[in-house]
Design a protein with these regions (language model features):
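Extended acidic low-complexity intrinsically disordered regions
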Residues: 1-15
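Short, surface-exposed, charged amphipathic helix/loop patches that serve as local interaction elements
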Residues: 14-110
Length: 110
């Protein structure tokens, strides 16, 4: 049985300030196998993870690609976000997927 994958919304303050309105990404956790597959493709892994986990905005939308002059969704991300923002959003997807946080507890002797 496939577990329901958690989602969360993250605002990018720099883009919100430029747009004069909140710019929010809705992200979804990825299953273990998908995260591992994307990490094996080490070149631009952060961008691949963000593309796979971003629910909204639709990074494949022609209007968004046109606005940021990106021919591909990956190019759109690079034009839209700073490198640190890409990394932070990618980390957020990993955290939603159970990575980069403590998901276990130490068993005390006794």
């Amino acid at each position: 049985m496939k577990a329901n994958l958690p989602t969360a919304r993250y605002e990018v303050p720099r883009l919100s300030e430029e747009a004069g309105a909140p710019v929010v990404f809705t992200l979804r956790a990825l299953p273990y196998g998908r995260v591992q597959e994307l990490k094996r493709l080490t070149e631009e892994a952060d961008i691949r993870i963000l593309l796979a986990g971003c629910v909204d905005p639709d990074l494949k939308a022609a209007a968004l690609q046109e606005k940021f002059q990106g021919v591909t969704p990956a190019e759109t991300i690079k034009a839209m976000l700073l490198p640190g923002e890409i990394a932070d959003l990618s980390i957020a997807v990993e955290k939603l997927s159970g990575y980069r946080r403590t998901t276990i507890e130490e068993v005390k002797n006794g």
